[in-house]
Design a protein with these regions (language model features):
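C-terminal "cap" of GNAT-fold acetyltransferases
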Residues: 148, 153, 159-177
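A short beta-loop-alpha structural element at the N-terminal edge
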Residues: 4-20
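Conserved acyl-donor/pantetheine-binding loop and adjacent beta-alpha core of acyl/acetyltransferases
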Residues: 63-102
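Conserved GNAT acetyl-CoA-binding A-motif
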Residues: 97, 126-140
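A short, internal acetyl-CoA/4′-phosphopantetheine-binding micro-motif in the GNAT/acyltransferase core
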Residues: 88-91, 100-111, 139-141
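Active-site rim helix/loop that mediates acceptor-substrate recognition in acyltransferases
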Residues: 32-61
Length: 177
């Protein structure tokens, strides 16, 4: 399957395809994945081609359909820094040590290694930008067992638990470990 998957940095010209991707996620997946607004305007004006974000897409090489999307924000929200401080982790956005990560793959393409491919490309880019740690954007829902297993398989470490619209885990990955 990996032979027919193309991984690349998303561009402004991919905005329509990313909006279509998001519209094709199941409602269950949308409940678990909503790091930002998925309108064409928001993607074009605030996310794509913005130096504060790294966006990676996975496309079906044959149909050119976006089947996976990962966005990394190159700074951490203040309220997240406060929560992470409770785990003994001091995050300072001026040091550019931490980025946050939110991936998703269309339901019928999950469990094929696409998420790992998105993560690998993200890590490579963030490493070149001298980032050291990758945390989950908004954590991961505790009931999302498949995602929790994915992160653990990919060497994320469980750091703590918080409540926001239900239980969530905070996890962290050393990018160059």
């Amino acid at each position: 399957m990996n032979q027919s998957i193309q991984i690349s940095v998303a561009k402004k010209t991919d905005a329509d395809s990313i909006v279509k991707f998001y519209s094709e996620l199941s409602n269950t997946s949308k409940e678990k994945f909503a790091p930002h607004d998925f309108t064409f305007e928001y993607l074009s004006d605030h996310i794509l081609d913005n130096s504060n974000y790294v966006t990676i897409i996975a496309k079906n090489s044959i149909t050119k359909e976006v089947i996976g999307y990962a966005v990394s924000q190159l700074w951490i929200f203040d309220y997240d820094m406060i929560r992470w401080k409770n785990y003994g982790v001091l995050i300072d956005n001026t040091e550019k040590n931490y980025a946050c990560f939110a991936p998703s793959v269309l339901d019928n393409f999950q469990h094929l290694g696409i998420g790992s491919m998105l993560l690998s490309e993200t890590k490579e880019i963030l490493s070149r930008l001298n980032f050291v740690n990758l945390i989950l954007w908004g954590g991961v829902k505790c009931y999302n067992i498949a995602a929790v297993k994915f992160y653990l398989k990919n060497d994320f470490i469980l750091m703590g638990h918080f409540d926001y619209n239900g239980g969530n885990y905070d996890m962290c990955l050393k990018i160059n470990a």
